[in-house]
Amino acid sequence: MPFIKAVKSSPYFSRYQTKYRRRREGKTDYYARKRLIAQAKNKYNAPKYRLVVRFSNRFVTCQIVSSRVNGDYVLAHAHSSELPRYGIKWGLANWTAAYATGLLVARRALAKVGLADKYEGVTEPEGEFELTEAIEDGPRPFKVFLDVGLKRTSTGSRVFGAMKGASDGGLFIPHSPNRFPGFDIETEELDDETLRKYIYGGHVAEYMEMLIDDDEERYQKQFSGLIADGIESDQLEDIYAEAYAKIREDPSFQKSGKDAAAFKAESLKHTQRKLTAEERKERFNAKVIEAGRA
């Protein structure tokens, strides 16, 4: 009798255990989270920090986060919407913007814990694979672990751009080069030139030049912001290099200057107010009267 219908009886429902809410919503991988936050049992009051990297359609978010019993605590936060302050006004979600955001959160976190002058990282990145090493007769480097969430860790992914930026910014992030752009699986070697090209927006410049030759209309549409500002492909490297230098000079957070009250009032214009019990009764009575007339 292979076709017996499974009957979910009362014992089934009484023993049923629901999964965590964020697992049901598909937001958290608890298998990975458990391993990211579990601390050694012989350490006390020594938080385990994570570099949390998340992407939206337009921006990149990087945070240095530690977990406690009552929730996660954010030590430092950086958002790619802050990059126009440093001269990067376009493509705030691409690989190079992820690198810049990672660099910004690293410098901001080190400044907060007083290690910015001791661990400067890679001031002039050339695409080489480097890990932050401890200095002699000084404090150890600030150690974090990469938290990619649910993002797929493909070779060349933007999440590793943020990690590379944070590593070059002076944080110690245990990693290998085999997920960076330019890594050859067969020879197991990293092409420094390819990685450097991504750090300074060279892949964007190449794409711009290709569109100029092949599809002028698409170029005008896709790079309208750069065209409006008179930026050409050969200027991108200098723009990104200057932005990295400015981030190192002043990584501090600055408020946007928007009026919070005005912003709230504007957002409430599109929010429907919940009716009171009296208003619901009045609306119901009005509908009954209208239906009786019909």
From Swiss-Prot:
The species this protein was found in: Schizosaccharomyces pombe (strain 972 / ATCC 24843)
Subcellular location per UniProt equals: Cytoplasm; Nucleus
Q: Name one Pfam family in it.
A: Ribosomal_L5e
| Superkingdom of origin | Eukaryota
Q: Which residues carry this modification: Phosphoserine?
A: S10, S81
Modified sites of kind Phosphotyrosine: Y12
Q: State the function annotated in the UniProt record.
A: Component of the ribosome, a large ribonucleoprotein complex responsible for the synthesis of proteins in the cell. The small ribosomal subunit (SSU) binds messenger RNAs (mRNAs) and translates the encoded message by selecting cognate aminoacyl-transfer RNA (tRNA) molecules. The large subunit (LSU) contains the ribosomal catalytic site termed the peptidyl transferase center (PTC), which catalyzes the formation of peptide bonds, thereby polymerizing the amino acids delivered by tRNAs into a polypeptide chain.
What keywords would UniProt list here? Cytoplasm, Nucleus, Phosphoprotein, Ribonucleoprotein, Ribosomal protein, RNA-binding, rRNA-binding
Query: What does the annotation say about its assembly with partners?
Result: Component of the large ribosomal subunit (LSU). Mature yeast ribosomes consist of a small (40S) and a large (60S) subunit. The 40S small subunit contains 1 molecule of ribosomal RNA (18S rRNA) and 33 different proteins (encoded by 57 genes). The large 60S subunit contains 3 rRNA molecules (25S, 5.8S and 5S rRNA) and 46 different proteins (encoded by 81 genes). Component of a hexameric 5S RNP precursor complex, composed of 5S RNA, rrs1, rpf2, rpl5a/rpl5b, rpl11a/rpl11b and syo1; this complex acts as a precursor for ribosome assembly.
Q: Which GO terms describe its cellular component?
A: cytosolic large ribosomal subunit; nucleus
Q: Name one GO biological process term.
A: ribosomal large subunit assembly
Q: Coding gene? A: rpl501
The yes or no answer to whether the keyword rRNA-binding is present is: yes
UniProt miscellaneous comment: There are 2 genes for uL18 in S.pombe.
Family as reported in the entry's similarity comment: Belongs to the universal ribosomal protein uL18 family.
Q: Which InterPro entries match?
A: Rbsml_uL18_euk (IPR005485), Ribosomal_uL18_C_euk (IPR025607)
Where this protein primarily resides, as one coarse class? cytoplasm
This one is known as: Large ribosomal subunit protein uL18A
Q: Which GO terms describe its molecular function?
A: 5S rRNA binding; structural constituent of ribosome
